[in-house]
Amino acid sequence: MVAGTRCLLALLLPQVLLGGAAGLVPELGRRKFAAASSGRPSSQPSDEVLSEFELRLLSMFGLKQRPTPSRDAVVPPYMLDLYRRHSGQPGSPAPDHRLERAASRANTVRSFHHEESLEELPETSGKTTRRFFFNLSSIPTEEFITSAELQVFREQMQDALGNNSSFHHRINIYEIIKPATANSKFPVTRLLDTRLVNQNASRWESFDVTPAVMRWTAQGHANHGFVVEVAHLEEKQGVSKRHVRISRSLHQDEHSWSQIRPLLVTFGHDGKGHPLHKREKRQAKHKQRKRLKSSCKRHPLYVDFSDVGWNDWIVAPPGYHAFYCHGECPFPLADHLNSTNHAIVQTLVNSVNSKIPKACCVPTELSAISMLYLDENEKVVLKNYQDMVVEGCGCR
């Protein structure tokens, strides 16, 4: 960790160790960080304390260590679209009721690419068949899978458009119950999903593989992977085999293949917080009365992940508005200070006995944010994190 980042961590240490994990980098901290980086002397905690601080931050994100993804790590467009949809960004994809249902029961979405070295299966007449194995060992044991889908890309074929025709294929997805053996070159399989598709458009096809993934993760069954079978219903084999992209073309570069290669997506819940939801801009509940400048209220605070050197593994957002609470809780407590009965009594006692502390200005309402990041295994994860944004402050 570079010296500048350690200076920043030292400035942020009190906020996290004292439980104020809603924000990381206040404007004051930015100025101090700039000064510390330019050589101004400042007291710094020990390396052990800084390491403990970073571990606490990572623990808050459910990580055991800081991810260090390679430059070749790929973020599937599907996951980026999913993030935009659930973060409510302008220009996000149109609503997808199937995805909304899946996300309504999950707070974590994970994506997996298959291991290409295990693709080949014997060809059969009129069919293209591949075995796909996805390593799901990075899914935490406490995460319950609520649904899973296999994404397969199909390309629009110019022959179909030029002839105003529609060549059809049937895509069958099987779970491998028992792998092929020396005595049997074909594995024992169970049909999971099937669909009839044509060549008139380029799009992703989604197949429900929830039963298989739940057996592997929740019931302890062995994961032998899937068989994807494309049945060519027309005779033009040379064209149709290139239509459904279940394997990489001979001269296709790594980047273009990474954008359309098959993808397994799991939706799960770790029992913490609420499911993913589309974040909408909140409206003010009521007009705020004129307050004293020093009274308890919400203040701006922007968290920039690049300031702590985490922008290499956090894909989106680059930062977020966390806000923080600060200000006086004077006697008598006004209605707009959103106080509890206990805070009112405590403030009353403080007015006659200074040994009793005043009520504190703290967050009274918090909301979640969605984060898209690369985990320790370079798997792309979309997760909902609770209590990250201060929505309201009060005296408590």
Curated annotation (Swiss-Prot):
GO biological process: ameloblast differentiation; animal organ morphogenesis; aortic valve development; astrocyte differentiation; atrioventricular canal morphogenesis; atrioventricular valve morphogenesis; BMP signaling pathway; bone development
Region (Disordered), start-end ranges: 84-121, 271-293
Sites carrying sugar chains: N135, N163, N164, N200, N338
InterPro entries registered for this protein in UniProt: BMP2_TGF_beta-like, Cystine-knot_cytokine, TGF-b_C, TGF-b_propeptide, TGF-beta-rel, TGFb_CS
Signal peptide: 1-23
Pfam families tied to this protein: TGF_beta, TGFb_propeptide
Tissue expression remark: Particularly abundant in lung, spleen and colon and in low but significant levels in heart, brain, placenta, liver, skeletal muscle, kidney, pancreas, prostate, ovary and small intestine.
Any one GO cellular component localisation term in the record: intracellular membrane-bounded organelle
Compositionally skewed regions (Basic residues) per UniProt: 274-293
Subcellular location: Secreted
Keywords for this protein: Chondrogenesis, Cleavage on pair of basic residues, Cytokine, Developmental protein, Differentiation, Disease variant, Disulfide bond, Dwarfism, Glycoprotein, Growth factor, Osteogenesis, Pharmaceutical, Phosphoprotein, Secreted, Signal
Medical condition linked: Brachydactyly A2: A form of brachydactyly. Brachydactyly defines a group of inherited malformations characterized by shortening of the digits due to abnormal development of the phalanges and/or the metacarpals. In brachydactyly type A2 shortening of the middle phalanges is confined to the index finger and the second toe, all other digits being more or less normal. Because of a rhomboid or triangular shape of the affected middle phalanx, the end of the second finger usually deviates radially. Short stature, facial dysmorphism, and skeletal anomalies with or without cardiac anomalies 1: An autosomal dominant disorder characterized by short stature, facial dysmorphism, skeletal anomalies, and variable cardiac defects. Distinctive facial features include midface retrusion, short upturned nose, long philtrum, high-arched or cleft palate, and variable degrees of micrognathia and dental crowding. Skeletal anomalies include patterning defects of the axial skeleton, characterized by 11 pairs of ribs and brachydactyly of the fifth ray.
Function, as annotated: Growth factor of the TGF-beta superfamily that plays essential roles in many developmental processes, including cardiogenesis, neurogenesis, and osteogenesis. Induces cartilage and bone formation. Initiates the canonical BMP signaling cascade by associating with type I receptor BMPR1A and type II receptor BMPR2. Once all three components are bound together in a complex at the cell surface, BMPR2 phosphorylates and activates BMPR1A. In turn, BMPR1A propagates signal by phosphorylating SMAD1/5/8 that travel to the nucleus and act as activators and repressors of transcription of target genes.
Family to which the UniProt record says this protein belongs: Belongs to the TGF-beta family.
Record-given protein name: Bone morphogenetic protein 2
